[in-house]
Amino acid sequence: MDDSGYFCLVKVINRTVLLLSMVSLFADVASEMLYPVIPVYLKEIGFSVLLIGVLEGVANFTAALSKGYFGKWSDEKGQRLPFVKLGYFLSAVSKPMLAAFTYPVWIFFSRTIDRLGKGLRTAARDALLSQNATPETKARVFGFHRSMDTLGAAIGPALALLFLVLFPKNYPLIFLLAGIPGLISVALVFFLKEETKPSSTLGKGNFFSFFRYWKVASPQYKKLVIGLLILALVNSSDIFLLLKTKEVTGDDRLAIGAYILYNLVFALAAYPLGALADKIGIKKVFLSGLLLFAVVYFLFGIAHSPVVIFSAFAIYGIYAAATEGITKAWITNLAHGQNTATAIGFYTSCESICTLLASILTGWLWGAFGSSTALYTIAAVSLVVLFYFLLFYRGNATTG
């Protein structure tokens, strides 16, 4: 990067954005250290595959609903940091909690605490990022944050592999060690500052009152969210891509290596593609990413060699960089300022529920018709979403 590029980065990425990005990096190191370990550990202590599925389903559903609720609460208070602090704290302490007992109820409680922490912080954190950007710089801000977050997601599994080599099957030790980067993320949160913003105009309500945002949302927001949720209904868990990798290669280490490659490409590409989105328009970059998504799932469908698998994971990283960060920027540009966290929370709650349904649907297709049919179906539906945005969504450079 030349001097002009460096000073441009410093101008866009202020202290708050940098700190939030570092917080996410360490939090993701902690979470992703356990991502490849938890399913194996649960089977070791006697969990059936069904019980593992129920556990993850309950934990993720908790996170899904809580994102909208706590996002709206954050807007009502006109504050972000209390939700960010408590959210990261709960996720950090949940990791070493797993080492304490092997009772199913305790494991359920620990995983639910972790996901509740994610639900607490997500909308408030993204609203805080939005407050520290302009419509012209949001894609870069969210892209930078995602790049740091995803770098942590690459470091975490690599550390897990190292610890499993050094301390085979010593899962309690790994859970305790995962608490260290988690607590570092909590410590960094306390260096953040914010100004209280005007409170939400939606008024208070019950746990599900964040759904009322749909009534006051702009037509552009509604069109965007409809398209994103159709995509989410087929965008199933990455575990299916790892299963396909294991099916093709027969090697767990290659599967984890491919997942690390995906995260590294994602981390490296997120900021440059965010900068490109700020320059040429969010919609153009997003649709390019959506086309890559279809290509990736087609490649996984035809894959019969590690070369195709690793190529698909690399392209998948570019897709994620072209969509995940800038989607949040897109949504916040369309939200009413005092309801930003509610707008994010509404979308992320609905997206999480759709993703859970997508995993169930993909699992059924996989079992009934084979892996290739499931993967081709996802590719086909993503192309339908691509045409939806081309035909029905209109926006300018900052709204798509």
Q: Where are the model-predicted features located?
A:
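Juxtamembrane intracellular "pre-TM" segments in multi-pass secondary transporters
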Residues: 2-14, 195-227
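Helix-loop boundary and gating motifs at the non-cytosolic
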Residues: 10-63, 220-258
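Transmembrane alpha-helix termini and helix-breaking/packing motifs in multi-pass membrane transporters
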Residues: 40, 44, 155-173, 357-373
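Helix-to-loop junctions at the C-terminal end of transmembrane segments
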Residues: 66-78, 164, 269-282, 366-367
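Structural signature of the two symmetry-related core transmembrane helices
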Residues: 82-96, 179, 284-299, 379
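Cytoplasmic helix-loop-helix junction between adjacent transmembrane helices
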Residues: 110-151
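Symmetry-related core transmembrane helices of the 12-TM Major Facilitator Superfamily/SLC fold
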Residues: 172-190, 375-391
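Helix-loop junctions on the cytosolic side of multi-pass membrane transporters
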Residues: 181, 189-203, 390-400
